[in-house]
Amino acid sequence: MYGDLGNKLVLEAKRTKQLYARSNQDVNLPMYHEDIIRNILKEVSNLRKNTEYLKEQQQLGMLDDKVAKCQYFVTLLCMERNKRCLLAYQRLRTDILDSMAWNNNGLDLMSSITFSQQDTNNLSHQEQEYLKEYCDLITDLKSGDLVDIDLSGSLVPPSDVFIDVRVLKDAGEIQTEYGVFNLIKDSQFFVRQSDVERLIQQGYLQKI
């Protein structure tokens, strides 16, 4: 039935959004459903042919005017719904890629050690190109006149100045205003949030 494939994409987007929210953004982006998208585009192409046929038959007076208008209108609605489903799916994945780029401080994620081969395989070729160019834009922006401003910092002011954190993976020593911390997996620290916010975003630390 027309629209079933688009509905699958929407459900997949909802699952991805919920998973991403629950895991505090520390999750792999699911595989890009290229086959479903290709079939949706094929479906849209068939629907367009149907609209052209219905319009032609209506102009020739070979179909009942009310029936033809109803068929034509429903077919257009199916095309529009498929378009909205595709855009919603692509927009969600693009927003997640943007967030990943900012969380990595604008560094090239495709060559980052935190970006696994599975992460790369889950992206379409166009998404890989988009992510690389978006990271380049962030790098250029932060190396210009705004180099002294932390553009990747959170827009929400912290509720606590100092927080307890747990180390999720080894990160070595970090120098802060209050001393040096050796971040060893499973260790805990009471630190100033602004000093470790970047490490939290990158997945090295977890706020307790």
Curated annotation (Swiss-Prot):
Its main location: nucleus. GO terms for cellular component: CMG complex; DNA replication preinitiation complex; GINS complex; nuclear replication fork; nucleus. It comes from the Eukaryota. One of its GO terms (biological process) is DNA strand elongation involved in mitotic DNA replication. It holds the Pfam family Sld5. It is found in: Nucleus. The keyword Cell cycle applies. The keyword Transferase does not apply. Keywords: Cell cycle, DNA replication, Nucleus. Gene3D superfamilies: 1.20.58.1030. Required for DNA replication. Functions as part of the GINS complex which plays an essential role in the initiation of DNA replication by binding to DNA replication origins and facilitating the assembly of the DNA replication machinery. Required for the chromatin binding of CDC45. Belongs to the GINS1/PSF1 family. PANTHER family: DNA REPLICATION COMPLEX GINS PROTEIN PSF1 (PTHR12914:SF2), PARTNER OF SLD5 (PTHR12914). Component of the GINS complex which is a heterotetramer of SLD5, PSF1, PSF2 and PSF3. Interacts with PSF2. Present with 1431 molecules/cell in log phase SD medium. This is DNA replication complex GINS protein PSF1.
